[in-house]
Amino acid sequence: MPELLKQRVETCYQQAETFFKRPFPRPQVSFKLRGQKAGVAHLHENLLRFNLQLYRENQDDFLRQTVAHEVAHLVAHQLFGDKIQAHGEEWQLIMRGVYELPPNRCHNYEVQRRVATRYIYRCPCPESDFPFTAQRHKLVRQGRRYLCRRCREILVYSGETRVE
């Protein structure tokens, strides 16, 4: 686990404990998060998940804003319970009052789109390319059939792939 991020989580908790004059249980921290989300707080599991790739690409802002954002969710839940809104007044109070940060809901990190292989299926219709995902292609190999909406013929794998 990146040591700076672990230290930042601890610093955020120490700030919250000083501000609210009470202890908070420390969460488990995981880097099993991919895609567009920078971080996720699992309230009932006391778990923080972070996107390691976005952390590496945006380290300074990630440590300052994203870590505090996710810790604030756990602190708000432990202080105010289940009935609060995710980015409601209580969470905003913690972001502004404890961490002195803007309560931004979303990051603006550039996210790399995943390279996807498409499997090209065809029917007798002219210009009928049907790019299937790997998941749909696997379903066809397992026996599922897909029909063209125009000619009602079964789509057949052409043997071609395309990277998007």
UniProtKB/Swiss-Prot annotation:
Pfam families: SprT-like (PF10263). The keyword Zinc applies. Keywords: Cytoplasm, Metal-binding, Zinc. Zn(2+) binds at H69, H73. The active site is at E70. The keyword Amino-acid biosynthesis does not apply. GO terms for molecular function: zinc ion binding. One of its GO terms (biological process) is response to stress. It comes from the Bacteria. It is found in: Cytoplasm. Belongs to the SprT family. This is Protein SprT. It comes from Pseudomonas entomophila (strain L48). The lineage of its organism: Bacteria, Pseudomonadati, Pseudomonadota, Gammaproteobacteria, Pseudomonadales.
